[in-house]
Structure formats: structure tokens, C-alpha cells
A protein has these predicted regions:
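Repeated scaffold domains used in trafficking and secretory/extracellular systems
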Residues: 171-172, 212-218, 254-263, 303-318
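Sequence/structural segment immediately N-terminal to covalent heme-attachment motifs in c-type
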Residues: 64-85, 107-114
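Short loop/turn segments that connect beta-strands within beta-propeller blades
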Residues: 198-200, 239-242, 287-289, 341-344
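A short beta-strand motif characteristic of beta-propeller blades
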Residues: 202-207, 245-250, 291-307, 345-352
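Electrostatic cytochrome c docking/interface patches
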Residues: 40-74
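Short coil/turn segments that connect the beta-strands within blades of beta-propeller domains
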Residues: 180-181, 221-223, 268-270, 323-324
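Beta-strand-rich domains and repeat architectures in extracellular enzymes and scaffolds
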Residues: 159-220
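Extracytoplasmic electron-transfer domains, predominantly the class I c-type cytochrome c fold
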Residues: 27-43, 86, 90, 96-146
Length: 352
């Protein structure tokens, strides 16, 4: 009798346990999700805690924010010069998303890796980019291009530094270098230039500059050397110092290619001018301090189709020896701007 009662109690407890389990399971159950899916597919994804780049185009392949920032850096350093900051094309073809997404990731990887006969470098097979970076860039150019910020007088003034005031600089040359025979050699990826004595073939100095110096220009007097990096940082180097070095610096934009100084009689070394790819503008500065004085935009209508262009990049700038003028070349609008600085407060700009 006792055995029967104990068996009955055990059975009732088992039924109670099963009932509670069923109720608990019902509380946790998700409609349309099987037990197998709950057990084997509900684990955390490694990407769950990674902040993703949010693209307004749903067809673009996924990228993390870190990948997007890496792609943006590579694009600026390697691609923007030919394809444009806004990716609308220049020397290279447009890389707008209507074209890149239609091409697809694998197609783009082939072009980035092997290049093309039209002049596209073989970034992958040359060793410049790793396989991972090639894949990253193929996905990056399928994202909507980020809108770069504008860069005005406020930003320039914040970056401006006079490291050696004019009053503390040499009043006469303090070295024996033949400044008419000095080479300024760009050390691209290290962000430096090397000054080479053309007479002795020895290195005078290696000077920290902006990224990938694009051009070095001598002042009319021969005393100052102006160098500008692709990141739009300008170094003013005094060649009269015992060891030539930077005496002033400024960043005039986000990407640039050109710098020049006034060379007309009576205005020698008075002004410096720099043109930027982004923002599309040129800036005139004090020649001996790089203090920014005036900014002029190059945005406007193209000469052929008379359409507004948001990114007319400033290419070369040349100073006239015969008139108080800078000749500024604006690429995408197809214009040459002759900037007369005789009356500086009322610049006369002639468009050709």
C-alpha cells in the first residue's frame, strides 16, 4: 500500500514538473521559431557590438565604421587626385554609386587589384594595397561619398603657426649654401622633404611637412621655400638660417596641389597664394608669415555646357614677373583666373 502511494506521489510530482516546464516554455517561446533554432541560432554575432556605417543606399555592401574610416583615408591618399573628392571623376572615371554598385564588388576588386590600360594603377599586385584593403576599397566606393566639411578663415587661423617671428629671423644669410642650387626633394609617404646641396650633393636637412608634398616653390628673393602637401598643409622654410627650417605653417584646406608667391617688382615675397582641391578655392596669405588674408571660391559654371560645378579644383598657380598677377587654373570649369593683386582690397579677377 505504501509502495502504491509513493508511486502515485512520484507520478503526480512528475506531471507537475512537466506542466510547469510546459508553461515556462510557452512563456519563452517565439512564434514561428523552432526549438532547434532557439538553441543553435540564437548565439551572439561577433558583429553585434561593432558599430556599423549607416548608408542611405540599401544596395551598398555592409561596412563597419572603422572600415569606412580606413577606406576614406585610403581614398584620400590614393584615389581622390584622379577620381575627385566627391567621386564625380576628373582624370579618372566617375565612381558614383550608380556605376559602382552596378559593377559589383568582385568586378571592382579586379580593377583595383590589377589596374587598367587607361592608367588605373595596379594597387593590389604592386603591393601598395593588401588583399584586405582591396576588398575594403571595392566596398567603400559603393557607399555614398561623404560630404567633406568646408574650410574657411576660422579653420585656417586655428591651424596657423608662426614658429619664428619675422623679428627673430636672420637679417643676413647665416650659412654657406648656394641657395640657387638647392634641391627640395619630396619624401612622399613619410611627410617630409629633403634639402639637397646641389654643389656638394649632400643632404642639408630633412624637414617635417604635410603629407605627400606636391610642389616646392622658391620666393622671388630666393630666401624662402614654400612647400605644400596633398593635405593642404604649407611649410614656409627660411633658407637663410644656419640650418634651414620651418618658420611658419598653415593648413589651407583638406586637399591641395599648388602654392606660389608674388614675383612682380615691388611686391616680391609680399604675398603667397595656395589653391585647394577641397574646398575648391584659393587663399592669399602674407608672404613671410602665411597669415591668411583673403579666400576666393572657384565654384561656378563650366565653360562648355554652362552647368554649375560644385568642385572646380585649383591646379597649378603661376606668378607673373611682368604684372602684379597670379594665374590660377580651375580644372572642372575649364577656366584660367588672372588675379590682379595691385589693389589687394579690391582684387580684380579676369576669367579666361
Amino acid at each position: 500500500m505504501k509502495i502504491a502511494r509513493n508511486s502515485m506521489r512520484a507520478g503526480m510530482l512528475g506531471i507537475l514538473a512537466l506542466s510547469l516546464s510546459a508553461v515556462y516554455a510557452q512563456e519563452r517561446a517565439k512564434p514561428g521559431v523552432t526549438d532547434v533554432e532557439m538553441k543553435f541560432q540564437a548565439g551572439d554575432s561577433p558583429m553585434g557590438k561593432v558599430e556599423m556605417h549607416q548608408n542611405i543606399n540599401p544596395k551598398a555592401p555592409p561596412m563597419t565604421k572603422a572600415e569606412f574610416e580606413r577606406g576614406k583615408q585610403i581614398y584620400f591618399e590614393r584615389c581622390a587626385g584622379c577620381h575627385g573628392v566627391l567621386r564625380k571623376g576628373a582624370t579618372g572615371k566617375p565612381l558614383t554609386t550608380d556605376k559602382t554598385i552596378a559593377s559589383g564588388t568582385e568586378y571592382l576588386k579586379v580593377f583595383i587589384n590589377y589596374g587598367s590600360p587607361a592608367g588605373m594603377p595596379n594597387w593590389g599586385t604592386s603591393g601598395e594595397l593588401s588583399d584586405a584593403d582591396v576588398d575594403l576599397m571595392a566596398r567603400y566606393v559603393q557607399q555614398e561619398p561623404p560630404s567633406p566639411p568646408e574650410y574657411g578663415l576660422k579653420e585656417m587661423a586655428a591651424s596657423h603657426k608662426v614658429l619664428v617671428p619675422v623679428s627673430q629671423r636672420p637679417t643676413r644669410k647665416q650659412n654657406s649654401f648656394n641657395i640657387e642650387n638647392i634641391f627640395s626633394v619630396t619624401l612622399r609617404d613619410s611627410g617630409e622633404i629633403a634639402l639637397i646641396d646641389g654643389d656638394s650633393k649632400k643632404t642639408i636637412a630633412i624637414i617635417k611637412t604635410g603629407y605627400a608634398v606636391h610642389i616646392s616653390r622658391m620666393s622671388k628673393s630666393g630666401r624662402y621655400l614654400y612647400v605644400i602637401g596633398r593635405d593642404a598643409k604649407i611649410n614656409l622654410i627660411d633658407l637663410w638660417m644656419a640650418k634651414p627650417d620651418t618658420v611658419a605653417e598653415i593648413k589651407v584646406g583638406l586637399e591641395a596641389r599648388s602654392v606660389e608667391t608674388s614675383k612682380f617688382k615691388g611686391f616680391e615675397d609680399r604675398y603667397a597664394i595656395a589653391g585647394t582641391y577641397w574646398p575648391p578655392q584659393f587663399t592669399i596669405m602674407e608672404g613671410d608669415t602665411l597669415k591668411p588674408l583673403k579666400i576666393e571660391s572657384t565654384r561656378g559654371m563650366t565653360v562648355d555646357t554652362q552647368e554649375y560645378h560644385p568642385e572646380p579644383r585649383v591646379a597649378s598657380i603661376v606668378a607673373s614677373h611682368y604684372n602684379p598677377e597670379f594665374i590660377v587654373n580651375a580644372k572642372e570649369t575649364g577656366k584660367i583666373l588672372v588675379v590682379n593683386y595691385r589693389d589687394f582690397n579690391n582684387l580684380k579677377i579676369t576669367s579666361i
